[in-house]
Amino acid sequence: MVKINGESLEIAGRTIAQYLATTSYDIRRIAIECNGEIVPKAVYETTILQDGDIVEVVSF
């Protein structure tokens, strides 16, 4: 399970980009933190979410 904004989801093994494709977030207007670290947009395609990750998505 991956916890995103407090909600547990069965998305371990997917990339951040794959997760975002299932949402209505505007990728140009978000910031993502994974386990306390800001994730650069340049690595959304290659960052694989792992079981136990805690992710915060902030839109602005």
Predicted regions and their residues:
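Ubiquitin-like/PB1-type beta-grasp interaction modules and other compact soluble beta-rich domains
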Residues: 1-60
